[in-house]
Each structure stands twice: as structure tokens, then as C-alpha cells.
Amino acid sequence: MSDVTPHPALRTRFCELVGVKYPVVQTGMGWVAGARLVTATAHAGGLGILASATMTLDELKEQIAAVRSKTDAPFGVNLRTDVADIEARIAVMVDANVKVASFAQAPRADLVSGCKEAGLVVMPTVGARRHAEKVAELGVDAVIAQGAEGGGHTGQIPTSLLTPDVVAGVGKDVCVISAGGWSSGAGLVAALALGADGIAMGTRFLLTTDSRVPDEVKAQYLATPVTGTVVSTRVDGAPQRVVRTDLVNKLEKSSWLANLPRSLRSAHQFRSETGASLWSLLKEGRAMKEGSELSWPQVVMAANAPVMTKAGLVDGRTDVGVLPTGQVAGVITELPSVEELMGRIIGEANATLDRLSL
């Protein structure tokens, strides 16, 4: 664990809630947030979150066991609420003494109550105040408020506006973790000044030596300027921030009809790789349609996301895959270990707080 002693202001109620040394969360990035990265984050004093959306149930069991075999520190698992085996996944988490259930979508009331009764801290991700207020009414313990600067699926509200708005909306009983655009100790202090109880970072953790993303892909991230990302709906029908590559430029110029064959192939591939049933995919598509303003063509396109992300992040095939990223990639220039990163962030935060107190 990082041996940097945090300023008292950094010992937030979130630290007490989940039992971590520092109020820093490593987000559950699909194909990225596996046992190695989560373990490194836990060892460094932060909260690491496994990404289960791209795992089968057996793979999730293996990944949880791999983390637990190397650390007794708290960590979490990110879940999709629309998978057929959600209860089985939660049961595995409870049996392994996982601390946090992080949700990519608003969880159902019965999931929230069930997780809390089992001792799990419930923490969904939200992109608007109204979403935060809705889950707060269900009794969640914390929310990750992701602003527009964030990577992957994201909203339209800048982090600097979303964070205080969500804080005001959920009241004092729900911790707020600010996400989107953070990478430094000064950013951590800024988030706390906005009323947050900590920060969550994805791209910054992706760009560490503990991330399993191929080195050549990391190099492409490091070469991306602040203006080198785009929020596109051409990947899977929903707004998603990705690195602007030649493929993305081509997708941006194409119609949904031109992308339909790719989407159908992706759906078949994702079904084969995750063991998802055809019924579960159809059910998920219907849920997406009813819970959003997406058209049916956009729903069909949704299968693109995991397959194209895997092609880019795992296989390094940016000619056929995409690289989800936050805008913060444009200001990241090196690949530290997670322990080095955490020590640097807390050291910078300490120095920033000392400077502001003069």
C-alpha cells in the first residue's frame, strides 16, 4: 500500500464507508478491469472494481478468487442489471466477501435491498441529477456521477456542473464520487471542493503498467491530444466517447443501415463469447428500448460495443475496433504503476491543500 499519509481532508466518509485508505476509485472498464488491475488498486489504497459485463459467471468467479487470493483489502464488482444471472453473480460476490456492488445502470429496488441486506455497499453510476435522485430513493449508499468528459458511454453534462448538482440532489446520506476528467491530486481536491466524497478514474488507471491493455494500444492513447476524442453514436447507438481513429471517422460518416451487418455479427460473437442466450439478448434489447429514446436500429447496434471494444483494447485492432477514452487521455504522458500513481495523486493533493490553506 502507498505509504503517503493523506491530509485529514482526504479521509472522507467514502473511505469509512468502504474501508479504503484513499478516496479514489478505479472504474470497472470492460476488458480492462481484471484481477491484476483491481489487486494493484487495492494494494495501493484505492477501491478497484472488476468489470463483470464482459465475463461469464465462471469467469467472474475466477477473477474474484484471483483478487481475493492476493489481498484482503476491499474491492468491488461492476454489474449490468439486465443480465439473466444477476442474482447468481451477487451471490458469488457475497460468498467472496466483496465489498461494493457497482451498477452500470439504475438497479431495481429488489436488487438494492438484497445487496444491502447481504452487506454490500451499493453504488450505481449516474449521468444526471434526476437519475441520482431516483436511485437515492431506492436506498443506495453511493453514486458515481460521471460527467461528459468521461470515457465510454457518457452524458452531456460537464463534470464541474454535474458533481455539485448530484450532491445537492441526493442529500447528505449518499456519498458522491465524481468521475470524468480526473487524473491528478489537484483534480481530487477540486472534486472535493465541488462537494464530492472522492473521485473515480478509468482512463488514468488504464494507462498504467498494471493495466493489461497491450503496450501498442497504450501508446496510441498517449499520442491522443485533448481534441483527439469524439462522442459518437455510431458504435452502438448510444453516446460513447472514443479515440478518433480512421475507423471512427468512417463510422461517423456512415448510416445505421450500413452498420447493421456489423451489428448482427457482433451480437452473434458476443453471445458466443459470454454464453448469453438469444432470449437474454432480446430481453436486454427490449429493456434498452423501453428505458431510453433509442430506436430499434440503435438497439440492434448495441451489440457492437463489447465486441468492437475488445477488438481495440484486447487485440489491438484499431482498424476494426474502438478505444473508449476520457478526454483526460490528452494530458496523460506516462505509464506509472498503480502504486506510483496513487502515491503521486495523494502527494499532489496534500500539497494542493497545504497551498490553499496559506
Language-model features, listed with the residues they occupy:
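Residue-level detector of alpha-helix initiation sites
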Residues: 32, 181-183
